Curated annotation (Swiss-Prot):
Topological domains annotated Cytoplasmic: 110-133, 185-191, 237-465, 513-530, 583-596
Region feature (Disordered): 386-421
Reactions mediated catalytically: Ca(2+)(out) + K(+)(out) + 4 Na(+)(in) = Ca(2+)(in) + K(+)(in) + 4 Na(+)(out)
Glycosylation sites: 52, 67
Residues on Extracellular side: 26-88, 155-163, 213-215, 487-491, 552-561, 618-624
Gene3D superfamilies reported in the protein's UniProt record: NCX, central ion-binding region
Name the record gives this protein: Sodium/potassium/calcium exchanger 3
Amino acid sequence: RDLLLSQLCFLASVALLLWSLSSLREQKELDLMDLIGEDRKWMVGRKLMQVNDTLTSEDAGLRSSKNCTEPALHEFPRDIFSNEDRRQGAVVLHVLCAMYMFYALAIVCDDFFVPSLEKICERLHLSEDVAGATFMAAGSSAPELFTSVIGVFITKGDVGVGTIVGSAVFNILCIIGVCGLFAGQVVALSSWCLLRDSIYYTLSVVALIVFIYDEKVSWWESLVLVLMYLIYIIIMKYNACIHQCFERRTKGAGNMVNGLANNAEIDDSSNCDATVVLLKKANFHRKASVIMVDELLSAYPHQLSFSEAGLRIMITSHFPPKTRLSMASRMLINERQRLINSRAYTNGESEVAIKIPIKHTVENGTGPSSAPDRGVNGTRRDDIVAEADNETENENEDENNENDEEEDEDDDEGPYTPFDPPSGKLETVKWAFTWPLSFVLYFTVPNCNKPHWEKWFMVTFASSTLWIAAFSYMMVWMVTIIGYTLGIPDVIMGITFLAAGTSVPDCMASLIVARQGMGDMAVSNSIGSNVFDILIGLGLPWALQTLAVDYGSYIRLNSRGLIYSVGLLLASVFVTVFGVHLNKWQLDKKLGCGCLFLYGVFLCFSIMTEFNVFTFVNLPMCGD
């Protein structure tokens, strides 16, 4: 914590120094412009000044009489290609540059920005729910946030709002559709996570519709959006308590999760044990030699100790796959040791032990064994325990070796290094394609995943934030040029091209998670990130503009068609939840095809609305 505070102070002092230098430079430029203006007044005659004033007023009248929307292209630096050159084919270079910026944003966010946020959460001792609702949401939605900031403070148009709305619909319909279509299995979904995020997300979209209905946003409306996200963080803080209340109301107080109280007789017994299997090769072939562990534990519930309950919790989908695998291995070892330490065994050739202490019976109908020191086929109990201990030690060594190998593989994963080309043709092509990006990031952003750079996570956070801002600026600039060249409004480019480009990495990550059977995580992440996009991605830049930069001002929306797009966004939430409910809370190909079809309908309707097909909502873009 002390290291975190010191690094924060260092970054604050650097930011203050840069701000002071920038203010001093702007003041000098203003003084220089005043001197140049005074010299021109002395040099130019009064008649010429009157002519200039007349021209200025006429030009202002012409500008006010224009029945078109000023393009956002003029807010960026001048392009090296003319509009005619771009129409002749130079726009392809801008498309390639925009796609490269999409890839660069994905690399910076996944390999540098998110790991630094994880380190910050560890130092601040934040719970998993709060960290996921704050820092992790900011990490996955950083491109959309910076695009919105650029849309408010630079382009002063609707590209930021269009990107947020388009990305939100993409996250709900397209990501769920792709996961259902290509997951390769039917994934079960739980109702709690989906309903929790969907309900609050619906409230957020309703608030957005109310605030942008008059095509302007005031300071208090933007502040309400930010405060709604603070309430969402509080809800995530007490998510476990709210979930328990939800479970009690839906399933009743008698049904507990994970089989902790499924059998009252076993809970009341002081000498209780479970039926377990010895994970060795059985001598018979009619039945499977190994029973599934989760089926076995659910079929024969027993009173859990503290360590056993902890292991059961840590094999759920709330933990990383590596942790779940390690805890599942420990559960198998514990069950095996308990079998060997049990007091009765069958005297058959099979090594499956079945014992229910409450009834004091065994499989062949006899009572408990009178010779507790003897095991299966007369083998001494001490010998069995010694053999089990040796096998347990060997399994522990194998598990440690596997964990070491996994850690080595994790260390190898990460961004490409510019001076270490990988093996393989495909990997070499990827390395050559990303070489300029990896070269720049290698010398400017420390990789806090490496042990020797772990203490520099705040520097990683600051430098990666600057690179995300720079890449987002380049991305919006290129997309604005593409839209101006092709005659496409900025809001359509935001809903389609920018939204898909910034959300494709999240789509790929959700697909990987869904293929592992964790569809809950994929769906909840896609909907939960939309809450951050709406409330912080739009609310925070609007609040900064109307409260800090220009107090009391309004955020003007150029396109009246955005209200229809946001209305479709609200409808997509209802349709998705209703479709999941009709599909019996399962994510499969049928649900995936339906979501992708609805996403296509949304794109068609939004594009036709912005082009004034149904009604007049948008002025045409001004030419050169």
